[in-house]
Amino acid sequence: MAKAKFERTKPHVNIGTIGHVDHGKTSLTAAITMVLGKDNKDIKVKKYDEIDAAPEEKERGITISTAHVEYETKSRHYAHVDCPGHADYVKNMITGAAQMDGAILVVSAADGPMPQTREHILLAKQVGVPKMVVFLNKVDMVDDPDLLELVEMEVRELLSKYDFPGDEIPIIRGSALQALEGKPEGEKAIHELMDAVDSYIPQPIRETEKPFLMPIEDVFSISGRGTVVTGRIEAGKVKVGEAVEIVGIKATQTSTCTGVEMFRKLLDSGEAGDNVGILLRGIDREAVQRGQVLAKPGSITPHDEFEAEVYVLSKDEGGRHTPFTNNYRPQFYFRTTDVTGTIELPADKQMVMPGDNATFKVKLISPIAMQQGLKFSIREGGRTVGAGVVSKVIN
């Protein structure tokens, strides 16, 4: 089936619903499509059952169920992800299968914050979701206005505890069910929520506007011309004549881009998404290797120690059959290469079981160009046993 092409006249933002099981994430997702769909016939209205029966997808060998819906407001176009199960959220956020520029945290006014509310806020912080808006759902089930105030205070305190600005985050009260039933107060709350999302969730920086970065996949020597590195430009742009740094594994080197080639044609520049060969001035073939990155000078630094948020594959997903303990030494696969590293578990954690998610420190045997948010796989004998994201660079 041919996919309908979306008119890209409006800025695009990726968003998702997070929160505790049964607090109404999927109902809210359905309600948003329904309420916005009334004013805009291009929006596909999705029913609860269609969203809940999310198809399974594989991302880096991990099975994740995710529902994708799209809708638009007057000012933006949104791609929205909703996951049926808690484990799907954990996997989704860690692997970045569905990148989120912002989130809608759904909290049931009848229950207040619950364990998964906490875990999803923490995960959002660890994986670098920049901002979130709160939808206090099921307010039709709460008669006491003081109780609503109390729940709202509790949510704000929880957000602040995990370094989100709890005092300024918009909290919208409503009922997804009332919106689905077409009640005016229900629909009004959905419009309020989307206004808050439009204004509070920042416009993401496009890949082409970020500093230049290209993971090196291969290195060639061309007689009479010098050394050529190939790869796919991950971010930014590079022009002929610009200075670049070669970062990671060895000491950082500086060079100049003297040529950009794509499909055997010479170009003046390359940008995010292009598969290119870049000619480097004054660099020996032996001085560069796969696993390093080419970057705008000063934009990224090499590190061999970091803290990570990791999902460990279950046995059914082809992961380990047994838990691992402190000082476990697998391979960490960053961008294009494997680097051996040692894991240091937190003092209160004896082991990590297959199917778990955990936070721990890693010490690599050689430094890799990294910053918060970099994704990696954990491998053992060539098979993937985990997926992670750098939550904090240590040195």
Swiss-Prot record:
Q: Please give the name of this protein.
A: Elongation factor Tu
Give me the ranges of the annotated region G1: 19-26
* UniProt-recorded Gene Ontology molecular function terms: GTP binding; GTPase activity; guanosine tetraphosphate binding; translation elongation factor activity
Q: How does it assemble?
A: Monomer.
Q: Give Gene Ontology CC terms.
A: cytoplasm
Q: Which residues bind GTP?
A: 19-26, 82-86, 137-140
Give the principal location in a single coarse category: cytoplasm
As for what it does, the entry says: GTP hydrolase that promotes the GTP-dependent binding of aminoacyl-tRNA to the A-site of ribosomes during protein biosynthesis.
